[in-house]
Amino acid sequence: MAERPYDLVSTPEGVVARVRLRGSSVLVSSLLNRGTAFTLAEREALGLTGLLPEGVSTIEGQLRRVYGQYQRQPDDLAKNLYLAGLRDRNEVLFYRLLTEHISEMLPIVYTPTIGTAIERYSYEFGRPRGVFMSVDHPGQVETAFRNYGLGSQDVDLIIATDSEGILGIGDWGVGGIQIAMGKLAVYVAAAGLHPRRIIPVVLDAGTDNPALLAEEMYPGNRHPRVRGERYDELIDSYVSVATRMFPNALLHWEDFGAGNAHRILTKYAGNCLTFNDDIQGTAAVVLAAALGAVRAAGSRMRDQRVVIHGAGTAGIGIGDVLRQVMIAEGLSPDEATRCFYALGSKGLLTSDYPGTLRDFQVPYARPTAEVSGWPRDGEGRIGLAEVVARSRPTMLIGTSTQPGAFTEAIVTEMAAHVERPIIMPLSNPTSHSEARPADLIAWTQGRALIATGSPFEPVPYRGVSYQIAQANNALIFPGLGLGVTVCRARRVSDPMLAAAAAASSRPTGSARSHTTWYRRRRTGSSRLLNEARSVMPRTLSLTMAN
């Protein structure tokens, strides 16, 4: 195991970090380095005399400097790279800057800019972060974790991705470590989790992205993505080792492909503390948006007719949780299922669907007899326009990654039959959104209740500024992770997710107007943060080891 640069020690003044390192080694440790904020006494004790300019800064002074540097970056990718560099130098300053400007910087460290950073990973590769595990060496999983240098009680959360289904941009191989790092930053900034107690992991099974396979600078396995038994061996090894070495850690699954995400969650959910953000987190945040929208429309969930355009893991996960609410409101399971129309890559899911139905899609397939008179294209597909015209939905949800799929004709058809159409183009990044809020507002004469997956600027329309709600998983997963950690939960349950959704659905302050109808705030109450700090020491004080 790698030697730890510090020990956490309880003192009458609280928990402090007793530093083992000396000299320039302190300055290259991002978690210990405070740069010019080291006092003269700390510099002498840590062997830093002469290694820093003479002046001593406050963290407020450092914040002004780095925020100015950040603002001078020419574009969002440059800002993302600047923040990554700051994190590599001084994590205390990075997280202070991020928490001070969370609304401004969340789209930079997380969606949508993180998608561009992932695409550029081969060219912008710098300091390696996290743990890299290869399908070609599944026996090295334990060695990799040990080399990371954390003990069995030092880890609260492990964020793992195999990078097959990154956001809306697909397979990007080991570049997916960037999405794990982005999630880590949000867990810390929004919920107060300690960055050193979170491990980002990429499970490198290869890639089917031809651009990466041909790129000489690509740092991952340069072979086609491995599937089947060898892939399962890597996943089994990862789960077995992680749960044994870090028994209290929540295993967070991120951006796995449709063929594996549901299967992996189903396999391990009953045996360990595990959470799939794309399935459970997305479902919870969309449930929050849906509950708020239904409330704003003066209706009930059981009265909704829902079209889901994009019947993958996220879309069906959303359907599952909305369906459970309908059942809780009095519908039978069959009645609730009949409220949904889900479309895959080959149109409406039906009993005679022209493609292959995955197990999790089967419950949403409409009987062939029911749609026998509906027009189909030459390949036997029933398209979105026909589904909207025939089903007259009250709620239209997009998880298809097909930009512009919600056309003016489709939206006006929907709005002709419902007073307050609920429309959620959720695909990320922004370039993959099914519609632009400005168009949705114009096409519905300002009547639509809108939530998007990516951030959009307010929309002026007929003298009113419409604040666009973002159904961002960051409203759910940080607080969920904090709660699981504080109470030492053994499983992530459906009631936990329902409680998170209900809390996020309640409007506060400016969220009570126009298209923004549910909670937009930092996750985690001050009480929970205080409890978290009692079990997760924060590196706020330094002492020098003798």
Task: Give the label of every model feature segment.
Residues 2-272:
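N-terminal ligand-binding/catalytic initiation module
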Residues 379-446, 456, 488:
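Long hydrophobic segments that form regular secondary structure
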Residues 28-32, 107, 177, 224, ...:
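Hydrophobic alpha-helical scaffolding
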Residues 32-33, 275-281, 294-297, 421-539:
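Adenosine-phosphate binding glycine-rich loop
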Residues 197-198, 248-254, 300-304, 329-338, ...:
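Flexible, glycine/charged-enriched surface loops at secondary-structure junctions
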Residues 271-272, 276-395:
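Glycine-rich phosphate/diphosphate-binding loop of Rossmann-like nucleotide-binding domains
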Residues 144-146, 168-179, 210-217, 261-267, ...:
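Short acidic, glycine/serine/threonine-rich loops at helix termini
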Residues 127-129, 151-156, 194-198, 246-249, ...:
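Short coil/turn connectors at secondary-structure junctions
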